Amino acid sequence: MKKIYSTTLLAAIFLPCNMAVSAQEVAPMLTTKYSQMAPYNNSCPEKSAAGCGPVAIAQILTKYKQPVHGYGTVSYQSGANKYDVDVDFESYTFDWVNIKDDYRGEYTDQQAKAVADLIYACGAAMYAQYGSSTGVNNYAKMLYGLQHNLHISENARYLRRQHYSTAEWIEMLNTQLRAGHPVLYRGSWLFEEEDNGHMFVIDGLDADGKYHVNFGHFGSGDKFADINVLNQSGTNPGGRGVCYNAKQAMVINCYPTPEHTDYPLQRCISEEAIILNKDTLLRQITVNLGENFTLSCNLRNYSLQKATLNYGWGLEKDGQLIDILCQSTDGLSAGEKFEEARHLDVALPTTLEDGEYKLVLYSMSDINPTWSRVWASAPTEVEATVKNGMAGITVPDNHLGDPKLYLEQDITEVENTFEKFVPGRTFELKFINPTTNNFQNKIKLEILVDGEEYSYITIQPVFSQSKTIYHILVPQSAVAFQGKHITSIKASYYNTLDDDYTLLGTTEPSAVNVPTTRVSS
């Protein structure tokens, strides 16, 4: 068996905010300026917050003024408060005539009810968990409800940025915008061990490659933003300023198709990158026909019911299924994924003719008794090139390798613009990721203050092929700065492959010695 490992260093390819792939201006498509409180939450249980996800979907539907009504029914108990959510969508006729774009001025009771009913219907379809901070916690159930109850396109898919290079991600996002479709987007603001997730809408693109964001807060903070920053407030991630730059995901093809009715009751979604022979970095091998190799996957159950799943790798030629080469069986609860990846041994038939083939995940269940392609949240198609009794097997790039991060220049101290809220000191780090590998893990600052060493750790993403400026705020509560002198500061990132920190220098990480960077006190 011959193995080939990928080389992902792309030292000359960077995609900062002003270099979006195939950038083409798209004017902001939404004219709505909704939020989560009155009148938007008037129909929610006990006047709970409307929820950022329902507000985002309601704004998208208002652009299209479709559907006329919802479809089917939903019944569930919501969150810790155990609110009963029971909605007969057929009885919800959306009053598009009376749904205003902006409720910050005067409005009638009828106009208030129209938007409140729309947003509550969106929340019920998304299986929102209602409370003072309403959230949508399961994307598979959310997608199921959006399609079955609001007739969002059958091609709608939930994609996670971590599984794609920046170039791939931007091209997919731009394709949606050019087609005239706003994109349901989510991100997290990570600060002081808090993970504040938020759903919003990206609905435009400017000439500099920045994306117009409708954050769903009465229009407050709406702006064109760098996709690597997504700052609602402040300018740079890493501190008190709200930037939804982490854990990015989007729903593509998120638009209503009222005429479509044939949505599946159960499918599987590929949750993670495909791993070859249990080796994260292995991209390609050559095997004999009939020789076993291992493909690892994880699946999520797109259904409202527990399902008994049969799943396996199908062999395709020119888009047609030839055979299911291997399969396994597991039970999986509604909306849930496997706790651990599943490892399936695969062997290509010894009689296979020369040519190009694909290995594709298929599944069936007691709810959906027909073998169907698994939906992809991450790339899943495995290439198989057969020639003279041998096969080259290539899995998609999983973007999990070493990002080889380094700094564009020395660390400098900048003003803490949030001193009033979080006393401390702020340091500017200009990260460069020259690879196709995405990073989201620990960044450690080691600070020498009057001879005493301190460490401060923050978790942040540095996406592939990008240059991103971080303003990392180190709180006074973490490091005793007051009245003291900073002697030196150095930074490192946690490398999961080595299970250790890699020092960050101002040259590419092939450098043997990474100097300590000094800052002014």
Residue spans for each PLM region:
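Short glycine/proline/serine/threonine-rich loop/turn segments at secondary-structure transition edges
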Residues: T350-V360, A478-S488
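A short beta-turn/strand-edge loop motif at beta-sheet boundaries
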Residues: T286, N301-L309, L352, P434-K442
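Short, compositionally biased P/S/T/A/G/V-rich stretches that sit at domain boundaries
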Residues: T235-L304, D318-L321, E381-V422, A511-S521
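Active-site-adjacent structural segments surrounding the nucleophilic cysteine of cysteine proteases
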Residues: S22-G135, Y139
